[in-house]
Amino acid sequence: MADTAAGPGGSGTRPGSKQSTNPADNYHLARRRTLQVVVSSLLTEAGFESAEKASVETLTEMLQSYISEIGRSAKSYCEHTARTQPTLSDIVVTLVEMGFNVDTLPAYAKRSQRMVITAPPVTNQPVTPKALTAGQNRPHPPHIPSHFPEFPDPHTYIKTPTYREPVSDYQILREKAASQRRDVERALTRFMAKTGETQSLFKDDVSTFPLIAARPFTIPYLTALLPSELEIQQMEETDSSEQEEQTDTENNALHISTDDSGAEKESASVLQQSSSLSGSRNGEESVIDNPYLRPVKKPKIRRKKSLS
């Protein structure tokens, strides 16, 4: 004999076989194992102690085809009578049409040497949590049949604002402002430490606790004491204008003295007095820098020469 079939509580597949992760494949595999357990139980009741794997697979395929044919025929009889779900009468008619004696079923079910097959364990599928849940689902009103689809989730048609109300608590606002200020200071300190010169508290590790290097600052009030470029330019312009006026007055005095050389003695004495006055005035003008504080210049009158 080759491979032996499993007992009533076992299966006909090898223990080291790979199992599929697809739910449909798992369902077909579980159904196939259940049929193999049924075939093994029937063989044990018939007195067989072992069986080849090929024979067990053949009997399993025959049992599966027989059950599938009963279900297909029962459904066709059900739809023929304008119904959606088959009943016991449909199954009885199917068995009669297939040549099975229905009267022997009660005696076969009550046999003494029959073996009880435990139901396979049912694993519940993991429930996927819904992303949005708001409120409770509405049940169907009495006038809507139960086979109709359920109402959609309430979050699909209920207004659910997503914005948050502004916080008005004074303590929370102060804490938030303080934390923002602290974060800004830390970010600015790190930026200055990365871009500029730094000093470290530890000689071995320079990158630990970097400090911004201290730089000597100039005297803050020194710029207010020093004259600006505009003031220096104005001072130079006033000095040049004063020098030009002084040269003009000297030239006029010399010209007047040469013209009046042939005048009379009285006129010469008057001219000397006027020249001395003009010299004193020029000395005063050279001393006074402000043009608004200088004395007013009177026009000089020239006397005509008398015919002798």
Swiss-Prot record:
Bias-annotated ranges (Basic residues): 295-308
Keywords, comma-separated and alphabetical: Acetylation, Cytoplasm, Developmental protein, Differentiation, Nucleus, Phosphoprotein, Transcription, Transcription regulation
Top-level taxon in the UniProt lineage: Eukaryota
Bias type Polar residues, positions: 14-24
Acidic residues bias locations: 235-248
Phenotype upon loss of function: Death during early embryonic development. The inner cell mass cells of mutant embryos died of apoptosis.
CC annotations in GO: nucleus; perinuclear region of cytoplasm; transcription factor TFIID complex
Limits of the Histone-fold domain: 35-102
Modified residues (Phosphoserine): S269
Pfam families membership: Bromo_TP, TAF8_C
GO molecular function terms attached to this record: protein heterodimerization activity
Protein name: Transcription initiation factor TFIID subunit 8
Gene behind this protein: Taf8
